[in-house]
Amino acid sequence: MRRLPGYTTIIPMIEVITEQYAQAGSNCYDLGCSLGASTLAMRHGISFDSCSLVGVDNSEAMIERCEHYIALDDHSLPVSLRCENIQDTELANASVTTLNFTLQFVPPEQRCSLLSRIAEATRPGGVLILSEKIRFDSEDEQAAQTRLHHEFKRANGYSDLEISQKRSAIEQVLIPET
């Protein structure tokens, strides 16, 4: 993905981690599945036919596009997609759960509750794969990181207008923590 540094490393690592932690007869969840990159990585990391893979996103458009990408994939493990708020998703018997740049869109006061629910639903030996943007306490460090991130986007083909529009669109929605 051209807007997130390290994303091209994160997705293959989700597959590797899923290979190590997916358990027979369990559920694997991709919470905030978007277009399905993490979902597909998890799918390829699951070696048990008895696993259920569930992708959840609150955007119908994202779910539709995710369905398209899943249909193009040649892996045989079925994927169940749900269009719902991840805070309302029923979780149980999980061996692998992924929050890939998703938690930052959950209101800060509701994050602990969601993480607790995930922990309670996770089987012994299971794992939560969490990828997030962070913010720095130092204003100077945060400003430097923001400049570097914008330069990364420019280097990957984004115009200044696109960068500005994206920043405006997510300013009050994406709330990273340290």
Question: What are the roles of these predicted feature ranges?
Answer:
Residues 101-104:
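Short catalytic micro-motifs in class I SAM-dependent methyltransferases
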Residues 112-124:
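A short glycine-rich, Lys/Arg-flanked "PGG" loop and its adjoining helix->strand segment in the class I
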